[in-house]
Amino acid sequence: MEYDQLIQLHNIEDYFTKEMGLQIVDMREGYAKVKLAVEKRHMNCIGSVHGGCLFSIADSAAGVAASSYGSWATTVNGNISYLSPALQVKELIGEAKAVKHGKRISVFQTEIRDEEGNLLVRAEFTYYDLKKEIGSMSSD
């Protein structure tokens, strides 16, 4: 499956990220880039993007990067550092890059920046390769 097809599959079939408003905008082997137009529903009571939303962006970007190798993978572990609050931001950009790609276990580093390029989050995720070729599992 081509990367453009994988991007389209993620943007249409991933109901959680679709509900969030997260869009996959770039993907290649071991890499993914996602964007989120920040809306009121993403905010917490102090006017910052909710930490759970930021975690979901980071995990989703890493998950897309993990699937770039052609099979589905699932999160095993995630560690996140919130470096700066996401106050008064309009857009969030998450980029995930492979640190190590193994036969079953792979590690990805994700960074989230605002529209001005300020680093807000750095995270690391470990994924387990399910060895299920993309297209072989349905969402039914």
Where are these regions (language model features)?
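Terminal targeting signals and extreme-terminal segments of soluble enzymes
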Residues: 1-140
